[in-house]
Amino acid sequence: MKRLLFLLLLLSTVTGAMAKHRKVKVSTPYGTMIILLYDQTPLHRKNFVKLVKQHFYDSLLFHRVINKFMIQGGDPESKHAQPGAMLGNGENGYTVPAEFQLDLYHRKGVLAAARDDNPARASSGCQFYIVQGKVWTDAELDKLEQTRLGGRKIPVDQREIYKTIGGTPQLDQSYTVFGQVIKGLDVIDKIAAVKTDGNDRPLQDVPMKMKLIRKWGVF
């Protein structure tokens, strides 16, 4: 009996830990990305996990692609969209409260929530983007602090990341960052390099498929 109780307790502990540290496999025609969802943004993590479990994102498109900036997807209207149709206005009926964290910033590879222009900066319930960005110089970051960040200083450690790995610091503390690509950064570059139309939609569709990753494999 004691052994059984111990095993049940161990299983409960492991399950609880896994519920926090979630990874998602994103498959595309250009390769596969593995995304780690952050514990510091539980509302966004929970919502994203729910949608992945529901297969919400399967067959949706990366409908907005801007080289040296980001790749965006999650519009439910993109699933059966006609070629050339303008996308980006589809939603799933709710928003997620903003979860800004000073140590979660727009370095290359992060997963962040898209949103419309609302005073609370609440996130879309389904649309997201993955940052490609660019490498910045000190002079560019200095200018950005004055012109776009209202004088807010970029922390030294983050500044070094923007100068070496790159990203989109102009978006910091305006859009919720809630995950990070930990494998497959090259896939971002491949998708970002595709040819697009005047609305930044790829001329050739870039569909996605997502699955949760458990310790013992894909779920």
Language model features with spans:
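Cyclophilin-like peptidyl-prolyl cis-trans isomerases
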Residues: 17-219
